[in-house]
Structures are given as C-alpha cells and as structure tokens.
Amino acid sequence: MHDIRAIRENPAAFDAALSRRGSAPVSSDILALDEARRGKILAAETAQADQNKASKEVGAAKARGDEAEFERLRALVAEKKAEIAAMQAEAKELDTQLSELLAGLPNLPAEDVPQGADEADNVELHRWGTPREMDFAPKEHFDLASVQDGMDFETAAKLSGARFVLLSGAVARIHRALAQFMLDTHSEQNGLTEVNGPVLVLSEMMYGTGQLPKFGEDSYQTREGWWLIPTSEVSLTNIVNGSTIAEDYLPRRYTAHSLCFRSEAGSAGKDTRGMLRQHQFEKVEMVSVTHPDHSDAEQKRMLRCAEGILEALGIPYRTIVLCTGDMGFGARRTYDIEAWLPGQNTYREISSVSTCGDFQARRMNARFKPADGGKPQFVHTLNGSGLAVGRCLIAVLENGQNADGSVTLPQALAPYLGGKLTLNTDGTLN
C-alpha cells in the first residue's frame, strides 16, 4: 500500500517511480478519488455541525413556546441527519474505490534498482565457487540412477496429478536433512527465531503481504475461506499484523520450514519434468521486521545468510539484482541467488531476498513506537528463501553426481545422515 500523503505532495515523482516498473501514470485518478472522498467527509462534518446547532435550538424553541420554529428545527435536524448518512455512505464508497486502486499498484523500486523490462536486464553482482568439470555428460536430477526408486513422479501423478513428486527412502531422508540443516544454521548461527506456524491463513493475511487481491489465482483457497500459504512469508510477516512494537524490540528475525502451495498459473509448459516447479513444495523462509533506517543493511545480512547455506553445501552460485521489470509485486529491491545445475548447464533460482520497505506494513498496519516517545511509524519488512528445499536437493544431486549415477553428498549433511555421504545407484546410503 502507498502513502496517500506522499502522492498528494509529489504526484509526478509517484508516477515516475511507477513508470520504472512499466506501469501507467495513475496519480491523477488517485487524487481525484481522494479529493472527492475528502470533500464528502468535509460536507458531512459541516452538516453534522449544522445538525448539532439545530438540535440545541430545538429545546430553546420548545421552551419559549414557538411551535412553528420548533417544527422547522425538528425538520432541519431530520434533513441534516439524512444528508450526513448519505454523504458518509458516499465517502465510504469513494474510500473503498481509492483503497482498491492503491492495493492494485506495485511497490515503488529503490533508486539503485537497475532499469529493465525483464530477466534479460537483471544485473549479476558476484559468483561463488567454480562449477565442477565432469569427464562425463552430466544428467538432470530425475535421470540419475540413484534416484529412480526414491523420486517417483508417476505415483505422485496418480495420487494428485501433474507437478507433484513422491520422495521415499534415502532421497526423502536427504531432503529432510537439507531442511533440518537450513533450520539449524539459521536458528543457531544466524540468530533467527524458529517458528512453526499455520499453513492455512485468513484472506486478511494474504492481503497484508500482497498476494491479494491481485494474485489470488496463483494460490489455493479452501471452501471454508482459508488460503494455503504460497510461502511462509505470509505467516511470518503477519505475526506483526495490527501491532505496534517497541523500537527496542526490533529487529525481529524469524525462520520457518513449511509446506508451500502454488497453482503455477501462467507456467504451462515450463519445467514440466522434475522437481523444479511443483504445486506443493517445501521451503525454509526468513523474515525480518526492522526499523526503516536499518532495512537496507538487513537485506544484505539476509542475503549472506542464504548464500552461506549454499557455500556450506559446496554449491556454486551467482547472485543477481533484479531489474525493475522483473521484481515481485511487493518488492522494493530483490536479490536472486541462482544455483549451478550441471544437468541443465545453467544457473537456476534457488532464493529471492527482498526488502519491501513499508509497503506491507501499511497493508498490515504494523508500526513501532520510537524510543524517544515520538509518533508511531511503520516498520519495514523483508523476506527471503533460505532456501527452497526441493531445488536445493536438485542442486546437491546434480553437483555431486558421479559417472555411474551415484551421488557424493556434502560433508555438511553428515550429522543428519549418520555420516553416510554416498547415495548409491541402488538408492541406498553408505
């Protein structure tokens, strides 16, 4: 959500920022609705003052026996009451229209975000690790001999349809180990508070983080009205929904491992094989709630937390900053981390780390109380994958593959796998 006062003060700057995201200028429409709404509110207040004045005079007219004046004033009070109700209803309708217009507009990009139309204009910041040279043709994860029994797409399709997978045996254990390793790292080393939250949330929570109203088709809703979360960002960020937090309570840093659900609307034909794009998947999420002065530094901190997971696993990656045309709806700035997948001979996204400024906080009405006793201000919110567990499994399998189809697993997983770091071609660990 956007600050209407900032739009009033500098509508040209607002339109210019929107244009960087490819959106048409809309400040004139916003200000027209705002002016009409404020006009109705002022008219209702004026009518209320007239009604109050007439109400006081009714008693005086009655006391002095002026029946004609008494009746005139009574009629005036009733007339003003009807006027007030009508103007308040009109103001409410205009307020709804204004809120709906503002709710459909994306966040404004930070000044340092590169200008661009799509992913081709994203800017690489740095790389870590060197892709391993293999003296054989590397395979994609789903073709490896060692996962043929443990990564079952056929049975999953029988159970649920396309874009699902059934993991079993050692592959399921490695998947679980990765999630546990991420959670332990974030909670024990990176200082995040572990949360186990609901995966079913109210519409208000989806609105708070920006999934609604514009992107409802991307998620699943139950008959009872709950939404299945597309990411734990929804559950974690909305912990502060409707709250006013003491400044010394900031920053709040959360992490959670959860199931996530996405309809993948608009993704027909993309990544139809394997685990890269699923309707149901698992992710370890990071969320920070900060003072506005500290959000840029916090984003870099979160980025390092996510990058550190890949470094510990020995997975080569590159980090890019998304251009204005490729950022998500609620983001002010986004860094993507892409892991090297030798089976595809390319880097693929495994994490996005975004700062949203006060965009989500305004939708959630989440504020903090300054330590100096000043007026409450909106917090800043940030979110990032730390990491997508299924995609991390893909990266571990493909980067650790051997010529015979077995996989050498990262040393970091040894404590979670009983020290067994070889996934054999028969699907066993040793």
Swiss-Prot record:
It holds the Pfam family Seryl_tRNA_N. GO terms for biological process: selenocysteine biosynthetic process; seryl-tRNA aminoacylation. Homodimer. The tRNA molecule binds across the dimer. It catalyses: tRNA(Ser) + L-serine + ATP = L-seryl-tRNA(Ser) + AMP + diphosphate + H(+); tRNA(Sec) + L-serine + ATP = L-seryl-tRNA(Sec) + AMP + diphosphate + H(+). PROSITE patterns: AA_TRNA_LIGASE_II. Catalyzes the attachment of serine to tRNA(Ser). Is also able to aminoacylate tRNA(Sec) with serine, to form the misacylated tRNA L-seryl-tRNA(Sec), which will be further converted into selenocysteinyl-tRNA(Sec). Belongs to the class-II aminoacyl-tRNA synthetase family. Type-1 seryl-tRNA synthetase subfamily. Keywords: Aminoacyl-tRNA synthetase, ATP-binding, Cytoplasm, Ligase, Nucleotide-binding, Protein biosynthesis. It is found in: Cytoplasm. L-serine binds at residues 231-233, 285, 385. GO terms for cellular component: cytoplasm. Consists of two distinct domains, a catalytic core and a N-terminal extension that is involved in tRNA binding. It comes from Ruegeria pomeroyi (strain ATCC 700808 / DSM 15171 / DSS-3) (Silicibacter pomeroyi). InterPro entries: aa-tRNA-synt_IIb, aa-tRNA-synth_II, aa-tRNA-synth_II/BPL/LPL, Ser-tRNA-ligase_type_1, Ser-tRNA-synth_1_N, SerRS_1_N_sf, SerRS_core, tRNA-bd_arm. CDD domains: SerRS_core (cd00770). The gene is serS. GO terms for molecular function: ATP binding; serine-tRNA ligase activity. Its EC number is 6.1.1.11. ATP binds at residues 262-264, 349-352. This is Serine--tRNA ligase. Pathway: Aminoacyl-tRNA biosynthesis; selenocysteinyl-tRNA(Sec) biosynthesis; L-seryl-tRNA(Sec) from L-serine and tRNA(Sec): step 1/1.
